[in-house]
Amino acid sequence: NFYNNQFIKISNSFSVILNLFFISIILIGLGSGYYHLSPNDFTLVFDRLALTLVFTFILAMLANVRISERSGFHTLAELIILAPLTVLIWNYNGNLTPYAVLQFGGIILVLLTLLLTKVRKQGPCFTSLIILYGVAKLAEFYDEKIFTLSQNLISGHTLKHLIAALAVVIFISPLKVR
């Protein structure tokens, strides 16, 4: 296990999803690095594939802790195939709609689940993840303005990556080993 928690009881199914989440975070670093070395549609596939895996594992963790372990497993089983397929569709025909639906529909699904379900067991901090994801997207959107306002010190795109890293740390912080 990448993550062993002595203070919060983590089920085996949640532990599997959490470990896959950590692996996908590593894959994001590799995919993003590959893309930034040679920005083109081919290398972007690897960046986006890793992102779809992160979305998958976040939604599976949410279902696991807020609905049921079985629901978490079914979410994982379905999205592990469907999520990467959204990138392959985009790569094949240029249609980014399925990927956008996964990304932004997933955010809506997280928000609705947080609002409409009770906490069944301790889990990661989904609220901070959503907030920081929104802030990261804003940083990306205002990339050039941030770069100019910072007197060419940092771009919005770079800030997006730093905020995303912070989001992961805060997301898992309720599960930390003390």
Which residues fall in each region the model found?
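Multi-pass alpha-helical transmembrane bundles in non-GPCR membrane proteins
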Residues: 1-178
